[in-house]
Structures are given as C-alpha cells and as structure tokens.
Amino acid sequence: MDFQQNLITTIHDYTLALQDPVQLQQGLRDKPTTILIPCLMEEFRRPALRLIRSVLQELEELHQLVIALSAGSVEEVREAEQFFADMPFPVHVQWTNAPAVKELLSGFSDQGLDLMGPPGKGWAVWQGLGVAIRDAEVVALFDADIRTFTPAYPQRMLLPLLLPSSGVAYVKAFYSRLSLETHALQGRGTRLFVGPLLTALSQLLGDSPFLDYLQAFRYPLAGEFAFTRDLAVNLRIPCDWGLEIGLLSEVHRHVALSRIAQVDLGLFDHKHKTLGESPREGLQRMCSEILASVLRGLMEHQGTTISAEQVATLEVLFRRVGEDRIRQFALDSAVNNLPYNRHGEELAVQQFSSLIRPGLQRFQQDPLAIQLPSWSRLLSCASRLQDDLAQAGLDRCGDNDSAISLAPNARSECPSLV
C-alpha cells in the first residue's frame, strides 16, 4: 500500500474506514447507472456468478443490470432470466447471438457496416453498451467469473464517476492477482508479457507519450472498468484479446489524462488461462493479439512503427526485462511466503518472447483491427438501432418479425454503397 500518484489519478485502498453504502446509493439515485456483465452460459454453472448476484442485490438504487449473454437456445436464456429474477432493479438479458440479433445486424452490411463481430467479449460488450447507454449516465463492466467479488468492487468503481464535480469520465481497476487455493501470483499476461513489453518498447523507442500512458496503469489488462455515457458512445470496441489495451487506446484518444482514474480493488481472483500448446491457443494467442493492439496504438497516436531492424533488439530487451521481473517476483513471493514456480515463469517468458517476431510480421501485413464502430457513428445514420437491438436481444420465441420490425426504417437513414 502506498500513496503515489502518476499520470492518472490513483485511488488507493487505505483500509482505514468501512465503505459507506449510503454514499453509493445516493450517487445511484442522482445518476442513472447500469452494470454490464458479458457472460457465457457456462458461468451460470459456477459459484462466482452466484456471489456476484448476491452482492449486486444490495444495490437497490441501481438503474439496470444488463447481462450480455451468449447462449445456445431459448431455454438457456430463460434459465438466465430466472437466475436474476429476484433482483430489486430491472434486468435486461441481451441474447447476443439470438437469431433476431443476427438478422438485424447483418442487414447493415450493404451500408458498409460490419456489425457481425466475431463471437466473444468484444461483441458482447458492444451490444451491452448499446442497450445500456440508452438511458444510463454511467456504465460499469464486470466479468462474470470474479471469485472475490465484494460490495467494495461496485462501490469503488462507481463512486469516482458518481461523486459531484469529480470530473472523472473513465475508471479502470487494478488489483493483486493471487490464487485463492495456492496463494501464488497469477496474472502472467500482465506480469510477464505486457509489463516487459512496454518497458522494452520504451527503451527501444525513447520518449513515447502513449507508452507512458499505458505504463501509468497498474493493471492494464484489467477487465473491470466504468465510464460515462458521453465517453462510452464514442468508443470503438475491439473484437479480440486486445480489447482491454484497445479500449485504453480509445480512451486516450477521447479523454484528457485528468479525467481518468484507476482504483485499487485489493485481492482479486478469477478463471485462469493456460499457456496454450500453440500461438493460437491460451495465453499465447491472447498475448499475440495484445501485441498487435499495442503496435496499433503506437501507430495511431504517434505514427510510430517498429522496423525489421528493430525486431531483434526488441526480442533481446523483452527477454532481459522479463528475466529481471522474474527475479523480482521470486523475491516478492519469498518474503510474503507465497509459492513461486520460477522455472515455469522462465518458460513462460521464453514462450512469450518467441511471439514477438511472428506477431510483428502478422501485424505489418494486416495492421487494421477488427473493431465495431462507435455508437455515435451508428446513431448518426440508424437512430433507432439501440432500441431495435434491445428488442431483438429479448426475442425468445424464434419469431423474428416483431423483433426487427423497426430495422428497415433505421437502416434507411444510412446511404447505400451501391
């Protein structure tokens, strides 16, 4: 625990006073607030989502809970609705892959809009935001697999946006990733890839405002964040594992540093990923797509590219920084009496370093991201799309006519490419 501040405001957990629920409830009354949870059906079989539900039930003044659900059948969607049936606020279960949703969104292709993002968190977040920001001033996003969810999580994520005159538009979480079972350090993607990568790039490129910005976040891959409607409506949403870095890049594009905050949520644990057997699996795939997201941000914000001659230097720097971090994490674990698999960590850094050269080559061949357009762009030519999408996401009978009845009028506002 410290009190250091950096480029962005850091809200520490000083643990000296209990959270004040009255303060949060008053803020929720003053500013309509929605919590968004992207979710797979498998999460309903695990205890984490039940824990999250029990905590959120206490937020009586919450405007709405949006569940962006990928499900295989109407029966599964109804099961999800029943799961949240007793909440003291409205719950909208957006069936993201419903037939009506697919029919609605695919109809925009003739206007040059590809809204059928690959299935995953990015597409779910984009849909959930579209539904949430219709009438909410603040939106907070939490993953469905958080095993350590406490009342402090929504309180600390939301208060910076709800307090009068705070001026904050975007909040991102940071935390200590420890296994609940073994107490070992987790978060290899952040500790052993993103951290060493940003440091190595800074050493290679020198002065870099964008890299300084990313390094100001203590946990840049945190999937928990909150923002105002005015910001959310302007964000393009990445559709791969570069979602978190890509969103940070979008926030950097739209918001001054003084309007960004990060919040300490303390101990945090959720579902873990394996390293993967190939670069297209597990953490290896995730880190490859994160690398592309960082490189794209450097291009967009600074016009900076990594030349073929610099690749070898970046590989060497990454490996050295990664090995230095392992030494530091080993000592940190030893003093805190935590188990630490140093050999496993060394192997992970070696594997991550092998992703850099092919990852750079793939990025240079195709530097454009798979991004869903911002809602401000869509609403400029399809002003009723949010309502149509929400209606389609509620279709439970397989009869798409009622769910997409408004779509032709909405689409007609967009000029055809033909």
Region roles according to the model:
Residues 1-13, 88, 271, 275-418:
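Terminal low-complexity segments of carbohydrate-biosynthetic enzymes
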Residues 1-57:
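N-proximal low-complexity "stem/linker" segments adjacent to membrane-targeting elements
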Residues 15, 76-136:
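Active-site-proximal specificity loops/subdomain of glycosyltransferases
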Residues 51-63, 82-83:
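Short, acidic, metal-binding catalytic loop of nucleotide-sugar glycosyltransferases
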Residues 135-147:
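Short beta-strand-to-loop acidic/aromatic patch adjacent to the donor-nucleotide binding site
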Residues 147-179:
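Conserved donor-nucleotide/metal-binding helix-loop-beta segment in metal-dependent transferases, i.e.
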Residues 181-191, 202-224:
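A recurrent flexible, glycine/aromatic-enriched loop bordering the glycosyltransferase active site
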Residues 239, 248-268, 277:
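Catalytic donor-sugar/metal-binding loop of nucleotide-sugar-dependent glycosyltransferases
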